[in-house]
Structures are given as C-alpha cells and as structure tokens.
C-alpha cells in the first residue's frame, strides 16, 4: 500500500480511486498503482484484488484536470442573521433578500487514464481519479517513459 510511501520494490507508486468497475476491480475504491521494471500492478489498498499490465500492452496514458461548475443555493438565513446583527431589523430583511438565488462553485477533478490492449486483443481503458494529489502526475509521466510513449512538455506563454 502506498498511502505515504511507494510499494515495496516498485519504481514509483501512488493510490488512486477507480472510477468504473474493471474486470475484478470494484469502482469507487482506492487502488495502489505501482510501476515495476517491466509491468504495472494495480492492487486494492485494503485487500487482495489486483491486476497486472505489461508495458507493451499500454497504448496511451493521460493525466489531466476537469473543472466542473456547480450551482449552489445561497444561504438567505445566514445572510439575514448577519444583517440583523449588524444593522437590526432592516439589515435582516436586506440580508435575506440578498441571499436569494444561486452562486457558482468550481470543482476540480484530476484523472489518470490508461488505455491498453487486453489479452483478447480489445482496446480498453482504466480510469482513476487522483483524489490525493500526491504523486499522480509523476506516476503518469514515469509510466509514459516506461511504455516509450511521447512525454508532453509544458509550454508557457
């Protein structure tokens, strides 16, 4: 398990949440993704389920962010209380009215996706969410190197 350190004998590892059920791996559980000399190992952090992929099976690796904008209701009660404390009855009314409506909230999700060719010669993907934001991007970059996939360089403008 690599919650704070790499898996024993691995080059690098990190824990990710699996987004979709995949073979014997259950969704929404944490899995340790560990890179070894010639294969990738995916192991349930608190059990025995695991899967292995040889690097020559892997066709693409993606690590990136998605921003989701959600609408949230404003708290008219909280604003009414604050207005009432500061400015009395009129402040409470103004606070309650200003609290009506919605506000936008941004949620950022970081994804680690591995495309590969299965033993049945089918194209498949394994999608993880990087909920810890610890070493996810480093694992993805190292996996690209080990699979001889093009590593994208960051360009700043």
Language model features: what each stretch is:
Residues 51-54, 136-138:
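A short, polar/proline- and glycine-enriched secondary-structure boundary/capping micro-motif
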